[in-house]
């Protein structure tokens, strides 16, 4: 009550921001009259003027009002579109590094041109991030006329582009591309063997379109570059037979032994999307695996040599119980193709990790492709936090405002619409069974069809969309299906979904990014007329006028019928996805309506509220086909959605807490790589590594501050000669000296090593040897880093078991990951020094060939795949330790001053930098 009173008196944070923006919008208006008097050349010259003012010390904020006015005037001249005041406010929010929530049809693409132009004036490059290649190319082509008029170059970064084209795209002032491609380019840039192979030029400012889809929905799906590992085809085929021999247990056994309705061999946790073997199931599985020839008689699944077998067993169980054809995946041309759970699109070329994809292939009887080895990986959370300034826009961000602030430090600003929506959102209708629900859906569609009202039916899976399509076929109702199986025409289909009597069935939010215009979109037809060389200008104008008049008549007809009607066949886990579906109707003040039809069989209701609602229906003796329709029930469903959203937020936050540990190590490894690439000569670095390694070797045989009786000079000589290729006659030297201490022995070894090194450099030439050293170091860093990623992955998958020992799994993961990284640095040091000390040089050309061979070995990327991992595999058993807290706060990654050798290490270990991650420097 007190908070509500304060908001009434002083306004909410959102109200206060909008008040500030309106003042700036008024300033933008003051420049308009003067700019209208300028010719095109003078208006375009404003770009150079702004750059000069910035170079003189002015800030972007000070020139923002005039720059926005210039963009608005240029847009009027070039594109015949003038930015509304609401779009100017959205542009200000984006410039300030906030998320602008703007409804469907409010012109987010045009809004982005304002902050994009302003920030591109710095010359550091602006990235505009979209969800797919089609939207990236469409928006870049659409807006490039405006940017080119103002003297800005536009690039498009698409998948499958060659290196030169990509580099040109990033060199442009403004670069459009997909979130995946920007992330993969970052990873690839940190795998190159030469500076010239990099394509990105820094991460200064990014605007993320459909920011909720990219930073929330896809935040649990890391980007992974992987290569194929060993072939286990026979094992997958054998273990695929196991699930059919096991029985499903109904109910989860509680600590007091209750909760099991029907005993079995495994049980499924639908909330966490995991499968677990029971005690009985372990014994049964061992017995069956022995029969299948996958396990030795008398051996245990828990034996160290069978750890990977256990991993295959769980992959097979998940494939059979949680992953279903035409829901999580489809089978096309003998391949298992993942279906995006958020958009319903096919994810060509993507594969689930940890053997799950192979288990599904074995289940479906298609060719099994090899498992993948991770070469590089990063989450969207950690990638996008590296930008100096990040902003986003979407029609549905407010429900996730807390997560945006908590994870990305992004504030959400709700921009008021240019025209108030007239859409009517009707109460949900809940039926006892799916059959009754679909009967009601078809009846509603039929009613709209008779009245000439267009309908958009939203489904959660391909299976459901095809079920509804089949029911409509039986009623002989014409319709179009938009799902992952045929998304090539999705933008065209969705653009025409507003025509009279049009029935469109869409999987989730397929076609997002394209407006549904009531009466249909005549833009494409108009553009075809414009490029028809057989027509004169007068004929073109007449045809376009006729087309627009016809459209206006159809538009009025649809308005009279009630606008676009939205039908939801199921509630999604997130209220935001439901709001996205509803938001397709009522654009720019158009009328419209929406209704969700639910059944007690829906997963959301079954898990959270099904039993209670079923009891109410039975108590009221409701006849078949009679729905429950009440505000209280709708609120109850939204409450269930909040629980799921909260749980999903916990999972994403937990993934980030784990990934932050790996991210610190990734940054340090990439920093070392870049230092090696950017240095003209790494001789000093190699000398430091050599000294560090040899001092450690000497201390084993000749301990520090030790007596001569404790020395093992013969052992040291043998170790140096056999392992490090260094012959030093220490015993004779000590016998011939009056007094020698341990320090002098170490100095003698270091001097001998330097003489051997200098002789190799003299023989090959400094330039050739420097190239060889660089190749050796990069080869060692890259190969061992890949092994380290696999080690971290295995550590993460089993770390939840530490909870049973009353230990915090996250703290244990952090501690052990740090120890693993320390081991990695030592292995790299020893590997590099050993390779350089033991190499036998006969000529410079031989050395060049060796370096070239190593570079080629690292660059063999023909079998590399770019994919999202299955988010559920990322934190094994994550629900069990969600409450445990990690004592580090996720921090934005920023470039800063160089860390001093005696400063605390950035990885959080508490050690000095020189004794931790800086050991290689």
Swiss-Prot record:
May bind 1 zinc ion per subunit. It catalyses: ATP + H2O + cellular proteinSide 1 = ADP + phosphate + cellular proteinSide 2. The keyword Nuclease does not apply. Zn(2+) binds at residues 905, 907, 916-917. ATP binds at residues 87, 105-109, 515. PROSITE patterns: SECA, SECA_MOTOR_DEAD. Its cofactor is Zn(2+). InterPro entries: Helicase_ATP-bd, Helicase_C-like, P-loop_NTPase, SEC_C_motif, SecA, SecA_CS, SecA_DEAD, SecA_motor_DEAD. Keywords: ATP-binding, Cell inner membrane, Cell membrane, Cytoplasm, Membrane, Metal-binding, Nucleotide-binding, Protein transport, Translocase, Translocation, Transport, Zinc. It is found in: Cell inner membrane; Cytoplasm. GO terms for molecular function: ATP binding; metal ion binding; protein-exporting ATPase activity. It comes from the Bacteria. Residues 872-901 are annotated as: Disordered. Monomer and homodimer. Part of the essential Sec protein translocation apparatus which comprises SecA, SecYEG and auxiliary proteins SecDF-YajC and YidC. Part of the Sec protein translocase complex. Interacts with the SecYEG preprotein conducting channel. Has a central role in coupling the hydrolysis of ATP to the transfer of proteins into and across the cell membrane, serving both as a receptor for the preprotein-SecB complex and as an ATP-driven molecular motor driving the stepwise translocation of polypeptide chains across the membrane. Belongs to the SecA family. This is Protein translocase subunit SecA. It comes from Polynucleobacter asymbioticus (strain DSM 18221 / CIP 109841 / QLW-P1DMWA-1). The gene is secA.
């Amino acid at each position: 009550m007190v908070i509500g009173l304060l908001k009434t008196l002083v306004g909410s944070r959102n109200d206060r921001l909008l008040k500030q923006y309106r003042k700036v919008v008024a300033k933008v208006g003051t420049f308009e009259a003067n700019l209208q008097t300028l010719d095109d050349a003078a208006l375009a010259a404003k770009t150079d003027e702004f750059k000069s003012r910035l170079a003189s010390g002015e800030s972007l904020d000070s020139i923002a009002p005039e720059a926005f006015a210039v963009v608005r005037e240029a847009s009027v001249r070039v594109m015949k579109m003038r930015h509304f005041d609401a779009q100017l406010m959205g542009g200000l929010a984006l410039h300030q590094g906030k998320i602008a929530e703007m409804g469907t049809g409010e012109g987010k693409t045009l809004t982005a041109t304002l902050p994009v132009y302003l920030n591109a004036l710095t010359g550091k490059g602006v990235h505009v991030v979209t969800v797919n290649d089609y939207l990236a190319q469409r928006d870049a082509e659409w807006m490039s006329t405006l940017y080119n008029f103002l003297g800005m170059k536009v690039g498009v970064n698409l998948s499958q582009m060659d290196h030169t084209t990509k580099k040109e795209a990033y060199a442009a002032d403004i670069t459009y591309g997909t979130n995946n491609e920007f992330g993969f380019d970052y990873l690839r840039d940190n795998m190159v063997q030469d500076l010239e192979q990099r394509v990105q030029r820094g991460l200064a400012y990014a605007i993320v379109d459909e920011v909720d889809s990219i930073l929330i929905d896809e935040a649990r799906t890391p980007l992974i570059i992987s290569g194929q590992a060993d072939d286990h085809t026979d094992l997958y085929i054998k273990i695929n037979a196991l699930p059919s021999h096991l029985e499903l247990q109904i109910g989860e056994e509680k600590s007091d032994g209750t909760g099991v309705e029907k005993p079995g061999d495994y049980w499924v946790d639908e909330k966490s999307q995991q499968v677990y073997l029971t005690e009985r199931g372990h014994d049964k599985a061992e017995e069956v695996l022995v029969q299948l020839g996958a396990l030795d008689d008398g051996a245990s699944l828990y034996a160290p040599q069978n750890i990977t077998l256990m991993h295959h067993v769980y992959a097979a169980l998940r494939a059979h119980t949680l992953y279903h054809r035409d829901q999580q995946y489809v089978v096309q041309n003998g391949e298992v193709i993942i279906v995006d759970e958020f958009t319903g699109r096919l994810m060509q070329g993507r594969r689930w990790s940890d053997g799950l994809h192979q288990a599904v292939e074995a289940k479906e009887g298609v060719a099994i492709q090899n498992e993948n080895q991770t070469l590089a990986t990063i989450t969207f959370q950690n990638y996008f936090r590296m930008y100096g300034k990040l902003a986003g826009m979407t029609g549905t961000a407010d429900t996730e405002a807390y997560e945006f602030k908590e994870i990305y430090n992004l504030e959400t600003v709700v921009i008021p619409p240019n025209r108030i929506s007239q859409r009517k959102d009707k109460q949900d209708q809940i039926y006892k069974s799916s059959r009754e629900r679909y009967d009601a859906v078809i009846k509603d569609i039929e009613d709209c069809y008779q009245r000439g009202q267009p309908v958009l039916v939203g489904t959660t899976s391909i299976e459901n969309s095809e079920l509804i399509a089949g029911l409509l076929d039986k009623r002989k109702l014409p319709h179009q299906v938009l799902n992952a199986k045929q998304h090539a025409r999705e933008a065209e289909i969705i653009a025409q979904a507003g025509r009279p009597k049009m029935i469109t069935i869409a999987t989730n939010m397929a076609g997002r990014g394209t407006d549904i215009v009531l009466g249909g979109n005549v833009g494409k037809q108009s553009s075809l007329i414009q490029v028809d060389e057989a027509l004169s200008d007068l004929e073109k104008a007449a045809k376009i006028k006729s087309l627009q008049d016809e459209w206006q008549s159809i538009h009025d007809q649809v308005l009279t019928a009630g606008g676009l009607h939205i039908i939801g066949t199921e509630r999604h886990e997130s209220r935001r996805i439901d709001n996205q579906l509803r938001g397709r109707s009522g654009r720019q003040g158009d009328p419209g309506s929406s209704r969700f039809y639910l059944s007690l069989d829906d997963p959301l209701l079954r898990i959270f509220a099904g039993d209670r609602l079923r009891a109410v229906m039975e108590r009221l003796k409701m006849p078949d086909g009679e729905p429950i329709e009440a505000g209280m029930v709708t609120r109850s469903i939204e409450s269930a959605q909040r629980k799921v959203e909260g749980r999903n937020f916990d999972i994403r936050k937990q993934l980030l807490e784990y990934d932050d540990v790996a991210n610190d190590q990734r940054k340090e490894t990439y920093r070392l790589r870049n230092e090696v690439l950017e240095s003209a000569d790494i001789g000093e670095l190699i000398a430091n590594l050599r000294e560090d390694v040899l001092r450690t070797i000497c201390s084993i045989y000749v301990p520090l501050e030790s007596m001569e009786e404790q020395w093992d000079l013969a052992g040291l000589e043998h170790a140096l000669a056999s392992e490090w290729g260094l012959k030093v006659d220490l015993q004779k030297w000590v016998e011939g000296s009056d007094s020698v201490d341990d320090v002098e022995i170490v100095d003698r070894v270091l001097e001998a090593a330097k003489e051997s090194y200098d002789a190799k450099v003299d023989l090959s030439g400094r330039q050739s040897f420097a190239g060889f050293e660089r190749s050796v170091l990069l080869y060692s860093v890259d190969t061992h880093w890949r092994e380290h990623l696999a080690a971290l992955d295995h550590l993460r998958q089993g770390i939840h078991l530490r909870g049973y020992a009353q230990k915090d799994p996250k703290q244990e993961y952090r501690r052990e990951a740090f120890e693993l990284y320390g081991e990695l640095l030592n292995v790299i040091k020893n590997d590099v020094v050993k390779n350089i000390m033991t190499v036998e040089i006969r000529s410079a050309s031989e050395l060049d060939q060796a370096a070239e061979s190593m570079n080629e070995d690292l660059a063999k990327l023909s079998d590399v795949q770019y994919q999202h991992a299955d988010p559920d595999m990322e934190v094994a058993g994550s629900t069990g330790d969600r409450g445990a807290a990690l004592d580090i706060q996720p921090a934005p990654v920023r470039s800063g001053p160089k860390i001093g050798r005696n400063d605390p290490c950035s990885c959080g270990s508490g050690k000095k930098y020189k004794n931790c991650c800086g050991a290689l420097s």
